[in-house]
Amino acid sequence: TVRKRIQQLESEGVIKGYSAHIDYQRSGYPLRMMLFCTASIPERGDLVSDILAIDGVVSVQELVTGEQNLLVTAVGESDSDITPVAQELLDMGLTIADEVLVRSHEATPFGEFKTD
């Protein structure tokens, strides 16, 4: 059954938890900005929790290829909400190589998990 399969994936650590799928546009935070950053490689992993603690940051991804090795996503009501995020990243010693304004974001779960 589906329930047993989910329980199996949870016990194997494949499913680590559940989160809400938030429509930031409808919640009053229409601006979504991706900031491509560079951190020193020894510090990169240690910085993730500090970056997530910055007000407005909703995700951090470690990148393993290219010069930019952290992708920070922040949301806000306006540009003035994103500027403090960028400043805090700079204060942490990160370099911001690029900023990208996101118009929309859609996702789907990976559908290739095999059943026994």
Regions found by a protein language model. Name each.
Residues T1-D116:
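A compositional/biophysical signature of low hydrophobicity enriched in polar/charged and small residues
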